[in-house]
């Protein structure tokens, strides 16, 4: 397990190349939370934590926040294994947010955009 800061790029090929370079350059003896600590020190919370469990299909995920006073100021997401259901490829995507900064309309918009993107790439 390791936290990596991967900058957003509109162009997927550029995003993938940078993500691949960052992920494959993780030191074995490094601090798995080093990137997160640096961001916190800088006051930069413009992040989304995304975990992937590609070998597991799930119906729900529960997150435990161990740090006292942590209001969870960033979304926690988990993507799971894609499976075939009724001739369609589906996968679980869980998101945990603090209602102090995210409303239901934000979640509706987010999942709507995910659905649009998946429809777009499924027709390529």
Feature names for model-found ranges:
Residues 1-56:
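Helical lid/core segments from catalytic subdomains that handle acyl or acyl-like groups
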Residues 4, 17, 58, 70-73, ...:
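Intrinsically disordered, low-complexity linker/stalk segments enriched in A/P/T/S
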Residues 10-12, 56-59, 83-85, 103, ...:
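A generic structural micro-environment signature
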Residues 26-27, 51, 75-80, 107-122:
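C-terminal functional regions of eukaryotic proteins
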Residues 43-85:
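Flexible, Gly/Pro-enriched loop and linker segments at secondary-structure and domain junctions
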Residues 86-124:
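C-terminal structured interaction module
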